[in-house]
A protein has these predicted regions:
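Acidic/histidine-rich helix-loop elements
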Residues: 36-64, 153-170, 201-210
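Structured beta-strand-rich core segments of catalytic domains in phosphoester-bond hydrolases
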Residues: 85-191, 197, 314-315
C-alpha cells in the first residue's frame, strides 16, 4: 500500500509540474490586441442628424449604443484608444446607454478632462470630444498617466491649455492622453497614447496648417517628454490627416529628428503581407454619415515602436441598433491590430 501511495504522490507531482509549465507559457504570452476608434460623440451626432433630412434617427447615440457595444465586443481588443468621449458615452448622463456601463466591469477607463486636466470620474472632470483609454483589466494594468494639449504654441504655452488660443495652433481643447501600462501576461511595461487632432480652420488659418501644428506638437512632445528611450510604445489616434497629407507626411512619418522611430502599423502589415481582408481591399476609416457609401479617407492610424505587427484590419461592418435595423455604430471605422512585444 505504501508503494502505491508514493506512486500516487509522484503522479500528482508530475501533473502539477506539467500544469504549472503550461500556465507559465500562457502567462508569458507576448501579444496584445489594440484598437483606435472615434466613437462620434452624442452631441456631434445630434447636431448633424438634426441638420439633415436623410439620416436615420437610429444613428443618435441612445439607439446606436447597442450597435457600438456589439462592435466593441466583436473587436475583442485588450486596449482601446477612444476619441470623442462625452457625457453620454462615459455615463455622466444617460447611464443605462453609456458605453462604460454596457462594457461592464471587465474594462477600466482612463480619461483626463481636456478643459482643465483633472482626471475624469462619474462626478468630476468636464468632457467634450475627449480622447481616452479603455483597457481589459485582466490583460493590462495602469501605472500612471496624464494629458497634454495639441493646440497650444509650445514656445509660449509649453503644451498647457489656456482659455484663449493662438489661431495658428488651433483649438486649445485638442489633446492627447497617455498612460504607462503593464502588460500582465508578459510583464512588459509600455506607453499608450490616444489623441484626436484638429480638422477645422481658425481665424483665417486653414485646416492644413492647424493640423500640421497638431501633428508636430503630438510627435515632438511624445518623443521628448513622455516616452523614455527603449520602452515599447503605441500612438493610436484620429489624426484627421491621410498618410499623403502635409501634417502626417511632414511631422508623423519623418522620424529623422526624433529619438523614437514610430512606424505606421498599416504600412508594416501591407509590406509584410499581413493586412486583413477589409484593409487590403478598402483601406478607409470613415463613412459618409449617410451610410450610402464608404468615405475615401484613411485618417485613423496606429503607430508603434518596439512591437512586431502580426496582423492589421479595419472593421467596416454594420450592427443592429435599438429597432433591429443595421447601421454603422460611428462615422469612423475601428482600426485594430495584433502586436507582439519584441
Amino acid at each position: 500500500m505504501r508503494g502505491l501511495f508514493y506512486i500516487f504522490l509522484l503522479v500528482i507531482r508530475v501533473g502539477a509540474v506539467s500544469c504549472s509549465g503550461q500556465d507559465s507559457d500562457i502567462q508569458k504570452d507576448p501579444t496584445i490586441k489594440v484598437c483606435t476608434y472615434n466613437l462620434w460623440c452624442a452631441h456631434s451626432r445630434t447636431k448633424f442628424i438634426n441638420s439633415q433630412s436623410d439620416i436615420d434617427p437610429q444613428r443618435y447615440w441612445k439607439p446606436s449604443s447597442c450597435a457600438m457595444l456589439s462592435a466593441i465586443r466583436d473587436l475583442d481588443c485588450d486596449i482601446f484608444a477612444f476619441q470623442e468621449i462625452g457625457d453620454s458615452i462615459y455615463g455622466k448622463k444617460g447611464v443605462e446607454t453609456s458605453l462604460k456601463k454596457l462594457l461592464g466591469g471587465g474594462y477600466e477607463w482612463k480619461l483626463w478632462s481636456n478643459y482643465d486636466g483633472t482626471e475624469v470620474s462619474q462626478t468630476s472632470g468636464k468632457l467634450s470630444y475627449t480622447p481616452g483609454i479603455c483597457y481589459r483589466k485582466s490583460v493590462v494594468s495602469f501605472l500612471d498617466g496624464g494629458i497634454f494639449w495639441l493646440g497650444g504654441n509650445p514656445a509660449k504655452a509649453e503644451f498647457v491649455r489656456t482659455e484663449s488660443f493662438d489661431p495658428e495652433y488651433g483649438d486649445p481643447k485638442r489633446a492627447c492622453v497617455w498612460a504607462r501600462m503593464r502588460h500582465i501576461p508578459s510583464g512588459k511595461t509600455f506607453y499608450f497614447l490616444s489623441a484626436h487632432l484638429d480638422t477645422r480652420s481658425f481665424s483665417g488659418v486653414s485646416y492644413p496648417i492647424v493640423n500640421e501644428q497638431n501633428c508636430r506638437n503630438l510627435m515632438a512632445h511624445a518623443d521628448t517628454h513622455i516616452v523614455p528611450v527603449g520602452v515599447p510604445s503605441i500612438i493610436a489616434a484620429d489624426f484627421n490627416s491621410k498618410i499623403t497629407q502635409s501634417g502626417y507626411a511632414t511631422y508623423v512619418a519623418d522620424n529623422s529628428d526624433r529619438r523614437h522611430k514610430w512606424e505606421n502599423v498599416y504600412e508594416i502589415a501591407k509590406d509584410s503581407g499581413r493586412l486583413g481582408t477589409t484593409a487590403a481591399a478598402s483601406p478607409v476609416t470613415m463613412n459618409d454619415k449617410n451610410e450610402k457609401k464608404l468615405g475615401t479617407s484613411m485618417i485613423d492610424h496606429i503607430l508603434v515602436e518596439g512591437f512586431e505587427v502580426l496582423d492589421y484590419d479595419i472593421n467596416q461592418k454594420k450592427y443592429k441598433t435599438a429597432d433591429g435595423s443595421e447601421h454603422y455604430p460611428s462615422d469612423h471605422f475601428p482600426v485594430f491590430a495584433t502586436l507582439k512585444f519584441k
